[in-house]
Amino acid sequence: MFDMPNDQKIPRNNGNAEVDGGIGVDWGKTSRDYAEHRPGPPLSFYQRLAALEIGLPGQTVLDLGTGTGVIARQMARQGCKVWATDISDTQVKMAQTLATEENLDITFATASAETTKFADHRFDVITAHQCFLYFDLDKALPAILKMLKPNGVLVISHFSWLPLICDIAKASEQLILRHNPKWQAHSYSGRTYPNYPGMHPQFHYSGYFYYDVETPFTRESWRGRIRASRGVGASMNAAEIAAFDAAHAEMLETMTEGDFTVTHRIDAHIFSAGSVEN
């Protein structure tokens, strides 16, 4: 199970309207910072997936909630045939731009996880990175099940800083809360284990891993990473973001001497289509 901050559990129907007290979350507002400053998982993450025969050349992959296409682009680099969707048209346009710059052949579309439709049994792999909590599971999981091949897999993954271990992450979270007290995605304990809630009975666990990495940042890139978070860029207005960012810059001047690392935890929950008896 992915341990939701503040003991929240993943609801069966959780749209953006229900997040952070309904303040409104628009990831499209973060696209520039997201693309420039929000790092994806390191190559070791994809190597671990490859050891489980996920992300191999020639596999068909659908990346749901693709954002700026971090997972989709790496899968394409590895020789997969990739499709990717996101509910935000702004994010999709940024993802397409970044893929085009690398001459990567990825088919992008603007669609929610619940309304993404392809032919039955189309994909070897469907990925959902940092986005599964936003899905309406009653609608998304049956759709995912239909799109997966009989031996296909769903990969739910996260790449989260650890504020209880890293003082910089903790201080940044405290500052976010002073500017946006409704933000709920704070104080992640790092707790994770293979018992993901709310899954469809026609999925069963076929793999799971987690590990920690030290992710390098500069003051500027960490400011950008925090601006690209839900509690700042996706929910504050321009004036609020500017005020927060100025305070954040001042805080980092006193806490850091330049380059630093932030401890992150990576976890991946891998589900195969079909009940465990099959």
Where are these regions (language model features)?
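Residues lining the SAM
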Residues: A128-H129, S157
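A short, conserved alpha-helix within the catalytic core of class I
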Residues: F135-I144
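Conserved class I S-adenosyl-L-methionine
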Residues: F2-L56
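A short acidic, Gly/Pro-enriched loop at the edge of an enzyme's catalytic core
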Residues: T116-V125
